[in-house]
Amino acid sequence: MESLIKINFQKIKSVGIRVDFNVPIDENFVITDATRLLRAAETIKFIKEKNCKILLISHFGRPKDIFENQYSFQNLIEQFSKILNEKINLISFDDFSKKGLSHFKQSKENIFLLDNIRFFKGEKTNDMNFSQSITDELDLFINEAFSASHRSHASVNQMAKNILSLPGFNFEKEIIAINEIKNSPKKKLAIIGGSKVSTKINTLLSLTQSCSNIFIGGAMANNFLKFKGIPVGESLLEADSDKMIEEIYDNAKKSGCEIHLPLDVVTDKVETFSIDKLSSNSNFKILDLSDSSINLLDNLISKSEIVLWNGPMGMIENENFSRGSSKLASLLSHSSSQVVIGGGDTLLAINIAGINFDQFYFVSTAGGAFLEALEDKVLPGVEALNLG
């Protein structure tokens, strides 16, 4: 993989960096989690130290191909500057629409942010002309938004094809971590939570080929428990999941991968039951794991060299049902295994547990892109950089 460190910057004066500043905010536009900003900081600082002018490009939310004030970076630019400790200048939607990047070219300032790239009609259509209107003013394009790289959008795919393009430092780390999960001969455990089997079936099928053990938690486990004939009361279930689950078990059996399910659960009445004690006559909802399940996870983790965690183990937004995920986060933070964590809700679970991300081998900020990469899908953002 070609790296930024090896590039000769003698003739490179203007650099575009596709970042992911699609940060969570509260009702007052205050950023509640700056992780994605901070992940781009190393690349931004590196390019700045090369005395290059920087154009940052990002999306925010889901505007409808037109300026919408609630999705404008004008509401967040001051916070971006403060968090990154850099003066960042906004190129507004109107300014770019009328004058292109003329202000970027003529100004003596160093770092600019184009307003929400999804305001522009050429973005989601991966339009060549729109892409060139930006890359014609650049000498180098860097993708530092792995989390958006499953989108075939102009700022992810076409811009990277127009000029010399490279991955950012965090993008490289994402690729390396995912390749470790898929290709390393080390003994691997996948811990998969979330609510729907259908959204993760391809990921699970892929993981049965590379992992020795898979633990299913979260609301998704309800479907697996029901498939095994265990009563789940009024717990959240996905319709027509049996065929998918049967396929997962068949693939796992052929590959020598063992599927593990919770041994005990916490219900909506904050009562703990072993799964063999759940009654078919009771009105209950399964909302978390309990101690026996955590002990099983502890045992599986201790036998694994690489551990992947994606998806919370319970309804973490309620403190009564976040304990299972917090206990798991604590176990993983003290493990000697290479722990790779991915998915927005999983990151929230770690934050709720009060554990620092640097206690793990790697924490991915990507959601859909992370899962699609595990499924061996070709991501448009990766393909454009010729990274495989």
List each language-model region with its residue ranges.
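Active-site loop-to-helix "anion-binding N-cap" substructures in soluble metabolic enzymes
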Residues: 1-388
